[in-house]
Amino acid sequence: MAMTIEVKDELSRLAVKSISARRAEVTSLLRFAGGLHIVGGRVVIEAEVDLENIARRLRKDIFDLYGYNAVVHVLSASGIRKSVRYVLRVANDGEALARQTGLLDMRGRPVRGLPAQVVGGSLIDAEAVWRGAFLAHGSLTEPGRSSALEVSCPGLEAALALVGAARKLGVNAKAREVRGADRVVVRDGEAIGVLLTRMGAQDTRLVWEERRMRREVRATANRLANFDDANLRRSARAAIAAAARAERALEILGDTVPDHLASAGKLRVEYRQASLEELGRLADPPMTKDAVAGRIRRLLSMADRKAKVEGIPDTESAVTPDLLEDA
């Protein structure tokens, strides 16, 4: 929620010079935040937002661009309403504003998505469409496995118009129906960053990107730590299994085992969890890990051949599930 407020606060303070972009933002904000109502036979426009800055911006733009006065009502937090809400209302000139913004078509019928002049506008108009939609009903989650930038939409047509505006900006957005409500969602981290900048929330994007990078670094470090732990566990199990086999090999061969193979086997049995390199340093005289491995391999091979001839359990029989479970 904190990131959402940061984005909306930054966008609500953004200065926009283009008249067409300001008009597109107003149309989008009204479409996604409110609706048209018939009150006493007149068309009334209402838009409900969650920040006072947004309400002030919308009221100013409506007056500057269209010359109509809007009234802002404050709804205090109570009951199911967890926070203060601001409702902007245009009553006396509601129909005129609805026609000029394209919320009503030439025949006075409500437009279900966004008006053609907004959908077919320039790149800065597409940015304004997203800015208005986000100010109305957008959210940005913290960077993570399920991070997303999304907008709740008043209907499928509005959602598809928003997807088209994102495509124009080079961003892949998807329209989804979640619990009966239409939403437009952007999940890719790079795409979220691009869209934040396009809307005008560059400062918030930098904060979001920094948090995303920190999280990725932590995730990578955790994966490497888990990988190292797994490797250590595998190495320990292999060493314990080799020690058990070496001990069985010495039992099978008895006095017939050559001295150099016996010494390597005894080292393996005595230092069960040591690496081959460590065993090599413990040998007298010291030897390489390859030499140690070779001697243990020949010891096991010799013992297994003798066990096969005599029909007795070989060295593999010493490696039991219980032994590895305790490793």
From Swiss-Prot:
The keyword Metal-binding does not apply. One of its GO terms (molecular function) is DNA binding. One of its GO terms (biological process) is regulation of sporulation. The keyword Cell division applies. Residues 275-308 bind DNA. Disulfide bonds: none annotated. Gene3D superfamilies: Homing endonucleases (3.10.28.10). Pfam families: HTH_WhiA (PF02650), LAGLIDADG_WhiA (PF14527), WhiA_N (PF10298). Keywords: Cell cycle, Cell division, DNA-binding. Involved in cell division and chromosome segregation. PANTHER family: CELL DIVISION PROTEIN WHIA-RELATED. NCBIfam families: DNA_bind_WhiA (TIGR00647). Belongs to the WhiA family. This is Probable cell division protein WhiA. The lineage of its organism: Bacteria, Bacillati, Actinomycetota, Actinomycetes, Mycobacteriales. The gene is whiA.
